[in-house]
Amino acid sequence: MRISLKKSGMLKLGLSLVAMTVAASVQAKTLVYCSEGSPEGFNPQLFTSGTTYDASSVPLYNRLVEFKIGTTEVIPGLAEKWEVSEDGKTYTFHLRKGVKWHDNKEFKPTRELNADDVVFSFDRQKNAQNPYHKVSGGSYEYFEGMGLPELISEVKKVDDNTVQFVLTRPEAPFLADLAMDFASILSKEYADAMMKAGTPEKLDLNPIGTGPFQLQQYQKDSRIRYKAFDGYWGTKPQIDTLVFSITPDASVRYAKLQKNECQVMPYPNPADIARMKQDKSINLMEMPGLNVGYLSYNVQKKPLDDVKVRQALTYAVNKDAIIKAVYQGAGVSAKNLIPPTMWGYNDDVQDYTYDPEKAKALLKEAGLEKGFSIDLWAMPVQRPYNPNARRMAEMIQADWAKVGVQAKIVTYEWGEYLKRAKDGEHQTVMMGWTGDNGDPDNFFATLFSCAASEQGSNYSKWCYKPFEDLIQPARATDDHNKRVELYKQAQVVMHDQAPALIIAHSTVFEPVRKEVKGYVVDPLGKHHFENVSIE
């Protein structure tokens, strides 16, 4: 068969195009992260779990300021510079120009980031009259739990590229607070378009941000697919596609990692650590955790309103046995809420010893020598601060039984667990925390302040004035030595009042395949992939 020169040329061109397409597909870089669960949603303003932040605020959004990856150092983000007034109450941010928004099938942006987006992102959380305030449940645990509605007097637009925050008082950690996930900046133009279309909740479900990756597809409990954002204002990611393979079981995550079905996994089973250290295909990274695992006592439920009962339950638990069985060498017993690596730590506090007889005596003083029944909520997922909540719950249940307290273990799907706990349905509930900004305020105020007991993450529902009178002045002064002293006193008060059983600080392990380069373990518990490459 003869082929004309014209047809021959077309054939060669076609083959060339095919070859180019194949080459491009071969060169495309995909990284698969075996995540531990499904996100609660894609708007980090509305949620508090690290699982949700990994899937939303980290890849999709930016903040005015950011934490340098792997540190708690605050660096420029969407704001390229800022000034703080002499009285510490006015912060002026100058926005980076040329920052582009993602798009999706429902919305194509017509402008770049400007001050309207910043004002909207904070006004939605602060202002009950904002049309978006109640959309998607309207729960802003961080913003409200940290007392920001009272702290922030006004967020105002100076011009298209300048925004000013006016505070009611100085706030030492305020700049670091703005690098946290709840302070992610959303598009006002997108919000307005979805409100006009009668589908405002799409702002939170189909995210549009300015981050290094944009969302392509989400299948609940299966996978999330992102692509590198070509218009990203920062350094473009070195991978083309990022996939979250949602894998709740740590053993299955490890099996996938070994088969190269994923390249990074979080929260390995402590029992697998020794094997991972011997695995030549894996780089086992580790870091002391800026975290704490604890069991909150709901002081609004009897008999936990009695401090003697809370102390008794604390004395009854053998924490050393828990550290050995649950953490298996990857954690240390905790006596304070903040970890010993954090400034302000009070090492003079004496921990509750394991003392069942003391526990029985305190229960007798409380009129409960015959014991009582109680619920014990166990997390359904692994977290960096608790690798096996079910096992921990069973051990606490057995210890309490020895002093006459009969505990019923309760659990729910993770999102439902958090929702019900926030509503205060529990008597005792396993929780934990990974620091968000390296400041003690992020532990004390976020987890145990009066404001957090109403709307935030204070699952003990503990509002105690002597404690409040220490942590509030500590956040209002920029005198570091004074802050240290106030936080040390706060730890004594918290120890004596026992609103929670403080259990452990864990070591964070991150198994990463050796083909992965540039991955950094983050002290704040996030998983960043924008600077990662694959060989």
Curated annotation (Swiss-Prot):
GO MF entry, a single one: peptide transmembrane transporter activity
GO cellular component: ATP-binding cassette (ABC) transporter complex, substrate-binding subunit-containing; membrane; outer membrane-bounded periplasmic space
Superkingdom of the organism of origin: Bacteria
Family to which the UniProt record says this protein belongs: Belongs to the bacterial solute-binding protein 5 family.
Function as written in the Swiss-Prot or TrEMBL entry: Part of the ABC transporter DppABCDF involved in dipeptide transport. Binds dipeptides and accepts a wide range of side chains, including small neutral, bulky hydrophobic, and positively and negatively charged groups. Tripeptides are poor substrates. DppA alone controls the specificity of the Dpp transporter. In addition, plays a role in chemotaxis toward peptides via interaction with the chemotaxis protein Tap. Binds heme. When a foreign outer membrane heme receptor is expressed in E.coli, DppABCDF can also transport heme and its precursor, 5-aminolevulinic acid (ALA), from the periplasm into the cytoplasm.
Matches recorded under PANTHER family: D,D-DIPEPTIDE-BINDING PERIPLASMIC PROTEIN DDPA-RELATED, PERIPLASMIC BINDING COMPONENT OF ABC TRANSPORTER
Free-text comment on this protein's domains from its UniProt entry: Consists of two distinct domains (I and II) connected by two strands that presumably function as a hinge. Undergoes conformational change upon substrate binding.
Name assigned to this protein: Dipeptide-binding protein
Species per Swiss-Prot/TrEMBL record: Escherichia coli (strain K12)
Gene: dppA
